């Protein structure tokens, strides 16, 4: 679903409370920065960021040298918030249990570390809604849910937004369905590497 609107419609659920954000992509970064902004005007708001990996270097982007200036600025702002103590960062964190109680949630992480929070914002990935296409014979990569020929070109394990090579219509094709193509962000399936600029090349 959409990112939580912590500065708008969801403000009442998180203002003055402890919020755990899980994930290390752009959705997590934007949610964290919105919560930091909220915390500046809503005393008692506490922000914790949990990531599975040992490092968040990739989430910080390339700063001023980033090929995508907006991504570099997003990462620089996030790094600054963590370094200033506005966001508590937990690396190597995997949630093993969540228990609801009267005043919030108890989240157990690997190593039996417990956090007491009021809300969790899960920003751990997304997938395209392919229900409309269920009756078609699509050739999709099982991990990315993107066209089979496109998947290796956009795999986030090997590419970021700036390293995806230009590709043509052939990579979007589904041989069993001649003339059928999924285009735009949905064509990238679960990969967060979609850029309009790549489509114009």
Spans of features found by a protein language model:
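Mid-domain beta-loop-alpha active-site segment that forms a flexible
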Residues: 24-34, 73, 77, 195, ...
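Glycine-rich dinucleotide-binding loop and its adjacent helix/turn
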Residues: 1-39, 47, 144-154, 165-169
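Short, surface-exposed loop/helix-turn segments at secondary-structure junctions
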Residues: 133-161
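A Rossmann-like FAD-binding core segment of flavoenzymes
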Residues: 36-142
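Residues forming the flavin
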Residues: 6-8, 12-22, 28-31, 96-99, ...
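A conserved FAD-binding loop/helix module that cradles the flavin
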Residues: 39, 167-201
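Cofactor-binding loop segments of dinucleotide-utilizing enzymes, especially the Rossmann-like FAD-
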Residues: 24, 52, 185
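Short catalytic/ligand-binding loop motif for oxyanion handling, primarily in non-cytosolic enzymes
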Residues: 29-30, 58, 129-131, 189-191
């Amino acid at each position: 679903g959409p990112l939580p609107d912590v500065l708008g419609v969801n403000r009442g659920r998180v203002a003055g409370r402890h919020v755990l954000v899980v994930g290390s992509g752009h959705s997590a970064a934007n949610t964290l920065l919105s919560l930091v902004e909220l915390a500046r005007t809503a005393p008692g708001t506490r922000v914790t960021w949990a990531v599975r990996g040992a490092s968040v270097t990739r989430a910080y982007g390339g700063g001023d040298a980033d090929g995508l200036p907006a991504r570099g600025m997003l990462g620089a702002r996030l790094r600054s918030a963590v370094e200033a103590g506005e966001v508590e960062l937990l690396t190597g964190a995997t949630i093993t249990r969540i228990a609801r109680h009267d005043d919030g949630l108890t989240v157990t992480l690997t190593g039996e570390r417990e956090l007491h929070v009021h809300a969790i914002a899960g920003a751990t990935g997304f997938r395209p809604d392919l229900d409309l296409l269920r009756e078609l014979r699509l050739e999709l990569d099982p991990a990315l849910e993107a066209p089979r020929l496109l998947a290796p070109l956009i795999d986030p394990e090997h590419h970021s937004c700036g390293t995806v090579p230009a590709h043509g219509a052939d990579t979007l094709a589904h041989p069993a369905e001649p003339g059928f193509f999924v285009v735009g962000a949905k064509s990238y399936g679960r990969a967060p590497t979609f850029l309009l600029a790549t489509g114009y090349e």
